[in-house]
Amino acid sequence: MKKIQQLLMLSLISSTLIACGGGGGGGSTPTTSSSPQSSSPASTPSSASSSSIISSSSLSSSLSSSSLSSSSLSSSSASSVSSSSVAASEGNVVIEVDMANGWRGNASGSTSHSGITYSADGVTFAALGDGVGAVFDIARPTTLEDAVIAMVVNVSAEFKASEANLQIFAQLKEDWSKGEWDCLAASSELTADTDLTLTCTIDEDDDKFNQTARDVQVGIQAKGTPAGTITIKSVTITLAQEAYSANVDHLRDLAPSDFPIGVAVSNTDSATYNLLTNSREQAVVKKHFNHLTAGNIMKMSYMQPTEGNFNFTNADAFVDWATENNMTVHGHALVWHSDYQVPNFMKNWAGSAEDFLAALDTHITTIVDHYEAKGNLVSWDVVNEAIDDNSPANFRTTDSAFYVKSGNSSVYIERAFQTARAADPAVILYYNDYNIEQNNAKTTKMVDMVKDFQARSIPIDGVGFQMHVCMNYPSIANISAAMKKVVDLGLLVKITELDVAVNQPHCDAYPANKINPLTEAAQLAQKKRYCDVVKAYLDTVPVNQRGGISVWGTTDANTWLDGLYREQFEDEKISWPLLFDNNYNDKPALRGFADALIGTQCTNTH
């Protein structure tokens, strides 16, 4: 039987063990979570071997981080957990788990639990019975075989008096019989009201944790007839495997002709992945990018939720952060039809079409004026996704409040561009849309719109190709041809929202060709696809017409695609479309992007 090693903490260990800030630091108002979660009945070893003492200096040395910082491990579900820090040490990756997000109560069999409570001290649960504890998730494709879990815990005097034991465990989610149950700390090894570090090595004979298809539930539970409470002060997980490195120092520095290499980020729209508070997000953004797009907070419903009530606080903080870190900002988006992003006062407009257009003028002028004065915002998606997906394509009609309230007319599109130009003569104005890279009827409609604008002197500087593509569709030939049509119009071409979905319900013969788990072959194919797309951009768009390339997100754990296709994916998170994995580690896709920038041949090999 494995023994759990313990450390008597002489004092509260300093921040070398737990990074400050991130996806939820100490000092917040305590909250509770009591979501039930399935669990297999954990075995109860008859005895626990005595533990050796680890010195505080050796533990601090082995777990301290010299780089990177706080953020989240997995996606936005309540059952996912944030990671405060990840650091590489002697070939291993150390995950320091967020103690203010992502935990839940857990119980075996029919035993009930009362959830968990967050506090400045950590995560606390009441030991109501055998198998009651607290758990968090480690998201796929992280593998935990041979990983070492270290938990700093503090048991109450009542728990110590109950002579109950503590057990660290790990389970494959939705396959509850597969778990690590051999780590037990006997009551004799526990001291009341004293911080103790318990460690457990996940080491199963059948390597059941050497998998990437399932999330893993990690936790600690009381065994025996417990009473009292247990507080978990901190958790670190040291992974055995060395993280993949793309050997890219700074992606932004590889771009020819100094065009921007950008990324879309979350802000106050995502507490877990907020760039302003998540230091792991900050680390990867600072390392590789020089141009930022706010995923949501500069859209209309955030900026003017009610008529005349403009809210610049969150967007200003975002722009300020970009400025402080020498990054420019692309504004997204002044006008977008999506129902949840249109303020109710516009959706319910009862006045005339001209009054509605005047209200639109007010919104655009106020926003653009504000950021012209503030500085560092260099371009806007003026109108986003105004063309439908029909063949032949046309402007959106009944599904766009802007079309309907403008008198069942697309006049709002040109009006938006005219108003934005009047507000800021220097800012770059883009029309932005998806699927126009397919060189299809939608592309044709976009080109016709631009030609009409140019003929009538409606100001437009460029076209944003969102570029949400699959592994094989659309073809590089069609992507290049679509961009060439905009080049021939003399406009800037900007890839605004690039991602490459490993799985996508509408292409690559899904679900017949569904990929799960994420294999090395799939990652290398994605590497080549990123390279091919970026190379097509460089080959097609002249230097003076390049608006730059932005990726739509940092980590696979925070991609919009898994939410969009949740039903088709049957709640699996299997799109894996970005440059960094769930733990912010490099993926081969990053290498592929870099290869294209420096002119290296695109391959599906390392």
Curated annotation (Swiss-Prot):
Induction: Induced when the bacterium is cultured on xylan or beta-glucan but not on medium containing mannan. Is repressed by glucose.
Residues bearing a lipid moiety (S-diacylglycerol cysteine): C20
GO CC field: cell outer membrane
Membrane topology type: Lipid-anchor
Ranges of Low complexity composition bias in the record: 29-64
PANTHER family the record matches: BETA-XYLANASE, GLYCOSYL HYDROLASE
Protein name stated in the entry: Endo-beta-1,4-xylanase Xyn10C
Upper lineage: Bacteria, Pseudomonadati, Pseudomonadota, Gammaproteobacteria, Cellvibrionales
